[in-house]
């Protein structure tokens, strides 16, 4: 049973629960019992737009026998005109589970504090745990598990990276984080990984870090809402691009959560090349989130 009925970051699950969700996702992907929740409804709150998050959750809930309702910025004014606490209470009377993709993580916490139904973090500025589920499912499929798998994160210490650091520690991945000075993960995230017994190695030189990597993972340098930092970040991240030269002397597979800024953090040749896991990773958002929905709805 989950430590809470919500999924606000990856550590809302125990390690055993995380493994159970990944196993269930694999079973569902390969033809397991899908239509488990007829008549149930997922409410999807989108303050930030997304292709993968909306389609994967809406498709997943439909495949599980339920229904999903999309509420975008024009449909619901989060925190404007009506307190978030009231919105959460009202939604609790209409739907069975809420997925929220927001800017401010505190807004997500406010919704979760006043909802009587499970709340899922579809992304905030601080965390993206649904992406971590898909990432871990992809690695498990590719390597048969997590033992002796070495992953190198190259780029910004953003929300995707922070959830991945914690998820990697939970399953025991050998992780190295390579970021420019001033753009690393929050210290609280690194401390949490240390408490879990698997802190990442911190480095600032991509070339040396990837020599023994099984997976090289990158993400955009300029996240949504950071457009005014573009020139500053392009300068700071020079030399951190995942390209054919960086990968020339190793056999690492490549991951990226998408959308990619081709020619910035990754080249087109690498993104679409023979060593990419990116498209499996994108598909696995669907299956991992179905595994999560089954976990939450079965308990509630």
Curated annotation (Swiss-Prot):
Lineage of producing organism: Archaea, Methanobacteriati, Methanobacteriota, Stenosarchaea group, Halobacteria
Keyword Transferase annotated: yes
Protein species of origin: Haloquadratum walsbyi (strain DSM 16790 / HBSQ001)
PROSITE patterns the UniProt entry points to: CARBAMOYLTRANSFERASE
InterPro entries noted in UniProt: Asp/Orn_carbamoyltranf_P-bd, Asp/Orn_carbamoylTrfase, Asp/Orn_carbamoylTrfase_sf, Asp_carbamoyltransf_Asp/Orn-bd, Orn/put_carbamltrans, OTCase_ArgI
Function, in words: Reversibly catalyzes the transfer of the carbamoyl group from carbamoyl phosphate (CP) to the N(epsilon) atom of ornithine (ORN) to produce L-citrulline.
EC numbers, comma separated: 2.1.3.3
Keyword hit for Transferase: yes
PANTHER family, per database record: ORNITHINE CARBAMOYLTRANSFERASE, MITOCHONDRIAL, ORNITHINE TRANSCARBAMYLASE, MITOCHONDRIAL
Broad EC category: transferase
Chain segments annotated as coiled-coil in the UniProt record: none
Highest taxon of the lineage: Archaea
Binding site for carbamoyl phosphate: 50-53, 77, 101, 128-131, 257-258, 285
Catalysed transformations (reactions): carbamoyl phosphate + L-ornithine = L-citrulline + phosphate + H(+)
GO biological process terms on file: arginine biosynthetic process via ornithine; arginine catabolic process to ornithine; citrulline biosynthetic process; L-arginine biosynthetic process
Gene: arcB
Name of the protein described by the UniProt record: Ornithine carbamoyltransferase
Family: Belongs to the aspartate/ornithine carbamoyltransferase superfamily. OTCase family.
Compartment(s): Cytoplasm
Residues annotated to bind L-ornithine: 159, 219, 223-224
Keywords: Arginine metabolism, Cytoplasm, Transferase
A Gene Ontology molecular function term of the record: amino acid binding
Pathway assigned in UniProt: Amino-acid degradation; L-arginine degradation via ADI pathway; carbamoyl phosphate from L-arginine: step 2/2
A Pfam family of this chain: OTCace
A GO CC term attached to the entry: cytoplasm
């Amino acid at each position: 049973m989950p430590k809470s009925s919500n999924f606000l970051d990856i550590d809302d699950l125990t390690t055993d629960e995380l493994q159970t969700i990944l196993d269930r996702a694999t079973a569902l992907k390969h033809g397991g019992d899908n239509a488990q929740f007829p008549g149930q409804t997922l409410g999807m709150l989108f303050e930030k737009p997304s292709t993968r998050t909306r389609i994967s959750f809406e498709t997943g809930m439909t495949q599980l026998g339920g229904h999903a309702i999309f509420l975008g910025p024009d449909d619901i004014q989060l925190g404007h005109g009506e307190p978030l606490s009231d919105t959460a209470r009202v939604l609790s009377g209409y739907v069975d589970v809420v997925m929220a993709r927001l800017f401010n993580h505190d807004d997500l916490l406010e919704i979760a504090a006043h909802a009587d139904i499970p709340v899922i973090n579809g992304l905030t500025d601080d965390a993206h745990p649904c992406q971590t589920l898909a990432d871990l499912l992809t690695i498990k499929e590719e390597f048969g598990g997590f033992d002796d798998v070495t992953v190198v994160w190259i780029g910004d210490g953003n929300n995707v990276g922070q959830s991945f650091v914690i998820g990697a520690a939970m399953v025991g991945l050998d992780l190295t984080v390579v970021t420019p000075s001033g753009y690393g993960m929050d210290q609280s995230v690194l401390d949490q990984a240390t408490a879990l017994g698997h802190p990442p190695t911190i480095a600032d030189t991509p070339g040396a870090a990837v020599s023994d990597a099984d997976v090289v993972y990158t993400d955009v340098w300029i996240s949504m809402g950071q457009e005014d930092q573009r020139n500053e970040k392009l300068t700071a991240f020079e030399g951190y691009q995942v390209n054919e030269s960086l990968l020339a002397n190793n056999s690492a597979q490549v991951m990226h959560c998408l959308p990619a800024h081709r020619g910035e953090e990754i080249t087109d040749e690498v993104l679409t090349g023979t060593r990419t896991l990116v498209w499996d990773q994108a598909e696995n958002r669907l299956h991992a989130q179905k595994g999560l929905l089954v976990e939450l709805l079965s308990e509630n």
